Amino acid sequence: MRYKSMGDSLSIRNEKAFEAALQALRRHAIKDGVYDIRRHFIEDEQRFSNFSLNLDDFLFDFSKCGVTFKTLQLLDDLAVAADVLGRRDAMFSGKAINTTEKRSVLHIALRLPADEVFMLDGTDLVHDIQGVLADMERFSDMVRDGSYKGNSGEKIIDIVNIGIGGSDLGPAMVTYALKPYHDGPNCHFVSNADSAHISDTLSVLNPATTLFVIASKTFTTAETIANAQVARQWIMSHLGKEAVCKHFIAVSSALDKVAEFGIDSSRTFRFWDWVGGRYSIWSAIGLVVMLAIGGQNFRQFLEGAQHMDRHFKTAPLRKNIPIRFALLGFWHRVVCGYASRAVIPYAQRLARFPAYLQQLDMESNGKQVSLDGKTLTFSSGPVVWGDSGTNGQHAFFQLLHQGTDVIPVEFILFIKGHEQNLHPMYDMLVANCLAQSKALMKGRSVEDARRMLLKSGIDERESENLALHKSFAGNRPNMMLVQDLLTPFALGRLIALYEHRIFVEGILMNINSFDQWGVELGKELANELLPILRGENKTNNRDSSTLGLLAHIQARRGE
């Protein structure tokens, strides 16, 4: 297939049509009140099949959300009014949909098959991408088979990825998630400016067998460069200055700065300005993943994402999983007013997935200004949080079941585990996931709780008092994402689903999901405060709180 950029113009949606569709949706919600999900299952024996979608072995079950056929139709009308399909096609055609930075958004190109063509500004992106992938694979194979050696001639045993944000969250999450496929060197991740992070990591490593991957597009990210400098000094102090070139590689587009650091261009893997940090796991930022699981498995990871890309690009509106997922998210956030969503993977190896999604979702859709420069009149992206099941059941599920806020839950489940000898234990995990989903929807009435207490031998008066505490309102919306097994392909498909879902929610909110200006002010102020904290500059034009905190810190340090 041949793709070609269609230029930079981006259509402006008809706000009157969108507002009319949104008001119709809100009137529908007010008229029907709070939907009783339990009643829907009683009235519609085909509720599950009518309110779920499949993509091969991928199942998206949204039957436990408080929506009806009418709701879905009104949501589809909203998608049409927002020109979701047109905006989707604009991304796939290479238009500069990142309007504030005037950039195309083409992480989707990173996972295109080698035999396809994607032209942007006269350049075939697929040719360039495949070239970098081939370079990554050659280098990865050398490290993994031991032919690439450190300065003292020893095989590389440990990899330390130094990055932050998208250069850390994605690689760390994916490497941990794909542990059963990890047959390469040990992988470690350093991101925080807290010196403890780099110090604790280095304390257990051998310099002669350690390779550092410095991941920074601009090679100016403060935390990353600070950690990289500590690592470089560590290598030089043990192996000498000449060892830097053998023990450091870079993933960056700033070749001049990489060279200044001491890393040769032959050990630098590049990526492009149309790759946003939180979408960069598919690029050379994923090098540490390839080092861990090998090139073939990494390509399976890309193919899984491409599978979801094709579905998102070609499936009709009503059968399109990312679009339906996004419309339900918009319904929960904007129409129902639910302020957060919990993502609970019933897979310990996906324990880092909620943190990964926090950046992907909240950095994308945590905006207050629309594409046409107006302040939003409704809530934008929700707070995203979660943990792995069953751990979360013993931590925060109390709030999900009986708290005063309704928090939609997104369960992620795999039918099988990798540990076949522990199959009965995995059955326990699956049973718990299904049970929690049902419990959130079904709840337990006060009367049922009272009967249960009486049956257990508790007297009537105490049963009456305890029944309220042991009742559950139920009717808590939740969705289930089910795949067969956590493989590189399955993980790639899951991540791509969330990428597209977040993009579509941004379209519905009429915001730019691909910039992140909100992180800049804090960086600027930190740069101003650092020399003051070090006593190099005097304080001025500071608020009393900042002045007081600085004075307290300096006094306690004895400065």
UniProtKB/Swiss-Prot annotation:
The lineage of its organism: Bacteria, Pseudomonadati, Pseudomonadota, Alphaproteobacteria, Hyphomicrobiales. This is Glucose-6-phosphate isomerase. The keyword Lipid metabolism does not apply. The keyword Cytoplasm applies. The gene is pgi. GO terms for biological process: gluconeogenesis; glucose 6-phosphate metabolic process; glycolytic process. Belongs to the GPI family. Keywords: Cytoplasm, Gluconeogenesis, Glycolysis, Isomerase. It comes from Bartonella henselae (strain ATCC 49882 / DSM 28221 / CCUG 30454 / Houston 1) (Rochalimaea henselae). Catalyzes the reversible isomerization of glucose-6-phosphate to fructose-6-phosphate. Pathway: Carbohydrate biosynthesis; gluconeogenesis; Carbohydrate degradation; glycolysis; D-glyceraldehyde 3-phosphate and glycerone phosphate from D-glucose: step 2/4.
